[in-house]
Amino acid sequence: MRKINLLDLETTNKIAAGEVIERPFSVVKELVENSIDAGAKNITIEIEDGGQKLIKIIDDGEGIYPIDIKNAFLPHATSKINSIEDIYKISTMGFRGEALASISSVSKTKLKSRVDSYNFGKEIYIEGGKIEYLKDTGCNVGTTIEVSDLFYNVPARLKFLKSARSDSSSISDIVNRFILSHPDISFNLINKGKQSIKSYGTGNLKDSIRCVYNKTISENLINFESHKDIISVYGFIGKPEISRKSRTNQSIFVNKRYVKSKFITAAVENAFKSFLTVNSYPFFVIFIDIFPEYIDVNVHPTKSEVKFKDERAMFKTIFDAVHEAIKGELKESFTNFFNKEDINIYDSEKSITEPIKLEKEEVQIPIDLNSNNKIDIFGNNINKLPNNTELLKNIGIKEKNTLENNNDFYTSKQNEIYYANKNDECLNSCNKDNYSKIEKSLQKDNKNPDILYLNEHNRNSSPINIKENKSNNFYVDMKIIGQFNNTYILIEKDKELYIIDQHAAHEKVLFEKFKCEIEKGYVISQILLSPVVIELSEDEFNIYEENKDIFKNSGFSVETFGEYTINIKEVPLILGKPNVENLFMDILYNLKNMKSKETSTIKYNAIATLACKSAVKANDNLKEEEIKKLIEDMLILNNPYTCPHGRPTMIKFTLKDLEKKFKRIQ
């Protein structure tokens, strides 16, 4: 073993500088943070050759007292803290006292500063960590610091610097982050003598966003905020139309400090998930104000990462705030179309009495298969039941013939079905306040030989009174124009044209129903006539074992036999007739790509998304009744505006929009 050497001060300072000062933009970041901590309201940054030749920062802050000028350049000399306990209560941008010492050890540094109570200031010049002079000077209140010839005395670092263009871009980026985090401060970036960036310190975050980005982005923002006991989350998220294919337009600020956080990014992106298309990333500027003792900023040399005491609670707070803001914005856009006051929903709160019991007794109810009445297996259309008929918890249905033609959205064919109680919360999606209308009738007295008999369980259940629908005025001012390419439904309402993607809309309806069934534990399954056997690899089998409860709660009945072989006996009813093996493997690979710490809710949503995609029919020629049915199903959803993959389910054109297209108006 070689002899252990004690490094000299110059060497240790250069090594320390390598941790704090990576490139010229690191110098700008550290010095601007010092200016902000000094209370500056106007900060000018001048650079030459991407900051490699010169970085000059001018501020109008409080300045440095003459007695402290020399001490400011000593390692770990700071005015921000006194002891280790202060680190966990820090509210300033800097606190370690490393920046000036590190910068001056690898450059030629000149600093001038004056405080308001002195008539003159002090000037100090340091070259390679050595003080060349310290003298009195005349200057304005505040601080001016010049850093030239960065890394001139560290050739190993100098040769790894990027191009001047690249470093200029990095400096512009960090200045833009400061503009966003401190809209009350005016920033001015001058590159090679020309103004590159200018903000005006109005204190309005939207003005800062417009300065950093452009008018289009600033006009397509959604404000959000959420305030808890120890944390406030607020800022702006971009509407789906300004999403990008990269995360460059995302900014996170914790106590005004720009940080990078994968879990905060994940919280925002998961909130956006059903509103954006695949591989699109949302625009957002998010601020998190939290008591300093609940975070640790001392986990990275550049303070670009933070740790939170309770990441799960933080995730939920951010997710809820962003998700509600997006839903509210989309809901506002389609207020005229989704005016639920026009729909006369029956009062289910008054119709439910005792809890449902689980005793069984078989009763046969005949249903005429040749009549125009159909069974809605998703639970929105049952009407004019025979007197004293009870809707009960589990109804086993064995189909004898097909119930409807191939264009029927809502009929399952040739499956053994387990049918849920009409008053389950899940039956009408996730909207607890709205229950579906009663439309179609089940007829009792038809003697036709094509009769389907239902085995009705839970005879001792409490009766549920069904009110017959009164006429409503939702369709009075709505005109169904028709379909285009058997894919898009054209509707006129209140002098506005709505175009609905029928497949995306149907997928959303199924998704919300399935997701709610999972959440409430009421998933309806169908038994496969022939169980599906799948041989898995060891890795695939381990993923299944890790998530087998997720599959079970989602309506899959899976047995294992052999070493890595599974047998799928039941799948969710909502799937219709899927390719079971392909669907199962798609879900498995989707779960594999998720992190193990992802919440079960996210995993269930992923399963529901894949499952409902497999259930949607394509290119159906819909009857007017089916179009109305689809619209009614959308009405009871909390978020009918986008499909589970983020594509819009509908778009709207006002009369003014169309007249602009045809140049009738300007």
UniProtKB/Swiss-Prot annotation:
PROSITE patterns tied to this protein: DNA_MISMATCH_REPAIR_1 (PS00058)
GO biological process terms on file: mismatch repair
A molecular function (GO) term: mismatched DNA binding
Source organism superkingdom: Bacteria
UniProt-listed CDD domains: HATPase_MutL-MLH-PMS-like, MutL_Trans
GO cellular component, as recorded: mismatch repair complex
InterPro entries: DNA_mismatch_repair_CS, DNA_mismatch_repair_MutL, DNA_mismatch_S5_2-like, HATPase_C_sf, MutL/Mlh/PMS, MutL/Mlh/Pms-like, MutL_C, MutL_C_dimsub
Pfam family, one: HATPase_c_3
The entry's keywords: DNA damage, DNA repair
Presence of keyword DNA repair: yes
Listed PANTHER family: DNA MISMATCH REPAIR PROTEIN MLH, PMS, MUTL, DNA MISMATCH REPAIR PROTEIN MLH1
HAMAP family in UniProt: DNA_mis_repair
Similarity annotation: Belongs to the DNA mismatch repair MutL/HexB family.
Function summary: This protein is involved in the repair of mismatches in DNA. It is required for dam-dependent methyl-directed DNA mismatch repair. May act as a 'molecular matchmaker', a protein that promotes the formation of a stable complex between two or more DNA-binding proteins in an ATP-dependent manner without itself being part of a final effector complex.
Name the record gives this protein: DNA mismatch repair protein MutL
Organism phylogeny: Bacteria, Bacillati, Bacillota, Clostridia, Eubacteriales
